[in-house]
A protein has these predicted regions:
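RNase H-like polynucleotidyl transferase catalytic core
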Residues: 165-170, 184-203, 219-224
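Active-site beta-loop-alpha junctions of metal-dependent nucleic acid enzymes
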Residues: 99-121, 135-160
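Short, acidic, Ser/Thr-enriched surface-loop or helix-capping motifs
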Residues: 126-127
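Acidic/histidine-rich, metal-coordinating catalytic segments
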Residues: 140, 158-176, 194-196, 249-253
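Basic, flexible linker segments flanking DNA-binding modules
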Residues: 1-91, 172, 181-182, 195-200, ...
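Two-metal-ion RNase H-like nuclease active-site motif
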Residues: 66-78, 95-111
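C-terminal domain-tail junction helix/linker
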Residues: 59, 67-68, 186-188, 209-268
């Protein structure tokens, strides 16, 4: 039987160095099979199970039914200059497009460099079903975030979902009295993540990566307007056609079903 001292050393190296069983075995002079058995017993046999910040095993959770908790956040994307940006073109071509766009809009920074601006994407996702709602806005002020929340709550209500709680980070909009009052008016309990622990809101952070790969950076856009126009179609694909591993390879929309005939609420 493996001693407690050896087990602690194995776990310590796993947390600090994020090494595999063979590498840990080489460092500590124990069989790789023993290392693997210890990692499995401690539920850290996969690196994806370990929090990158704390080194502790991830504590995953899912609320029991739609609306029990929604996650909200804001992610930002640089606007696209007329003709496209440097991500798909050369840097020089992208720079010329920025110059032309700034000349048309008159938007320049204090040092006269072209300023294209930022799109603030307000996102809302249901914890249980992963059903997603999003709006592109020009800022992340409290009044804007509250407007998005109201419309998202109404959107979910149209699909038979009553929102009970909302989880956000500690951004200025979400810690404001206005946000608290709006939640009270909507009969929603506001909750916030622990400071410096964005992984607490990990579901929506993961959604942002999916959204970036599937929509924002998926193809060449000639302008910000063209990218914005593509968002509703991508959201429909995400909600209705993209299988989700955490949902047993079902879709978010299929998870939101009525008790009658097992028909998705979205299509009634």
């Amino acid at each position: 039987k493996t001693s407690q001292q050896v087990m602690r050393r194995i776990v310590d190296v796993r947390w600090r160095k994020r090494l595999g069983p063979v590498q840990i075995a080489g460092r500590l002079g124990v069989p790789a099979s023993t290392v693997h058995a210890v990692l499995t017993r401690c539920r850290i046999n996969r690196l994806s199970y370990i929090d990158r910040v704390t080194g502790e095993p991830l504590r995953r959770y899912e609320h029991d039914y739609p609306g029990s908790l929604i996650h909200v956040d804001v992610t930002k994307f640089a606007n696209i200059p007329d003709g496209g940006g440097h991500r798909f073109l050369s840097r020089e071509h992208g720079r010329r497009n920025r110059q032309r766009t700034a000349h048309r809009t008159g938007e320049r920074a204090g040092n006269w460099r072209p300023r294209i601006g930022i799109a603030f994407l307000h996102t809302v996702i249901d914890d249980h079903s992963r059903m997603a709602y999003a709006e592109i806005q020009s800022d992340e002020k409290a009044v804007t975030a509250i407007g998005v929340l109201r419309r998202a709550v109404a959107w979910f209500a149209e699909r038979g979902v009553t929102v009970e709680r909302v989880l956000s980070d500690n951004g200025s909009a979400y810690v404001s009295y206005a946000w608290r009052d709006a939640c009270a008016e909507l009969n929603i309990t506001p909750k916030r993540t622990r400071p410096y622990r964005p992984q607490t809101n990990g579901k929506i952070e993961r959604f942002h990566r999916t959204l970036g790969d599937g929509w924002a950076y998926a193809r060449f856009y000639e302008s910000t307007d063209q990218r914005n126009t593509a968002l509703p179609g991508w959201l429909h694909f995400y909600n209705h056609h993209r299988a989700h591993g955490a949902l047993g390879w079902s879709t978010p929309a299929a998870t939101l079903t009525t008790l009658r005939d097992n028909v998705p609420v979205e299509h009634i």
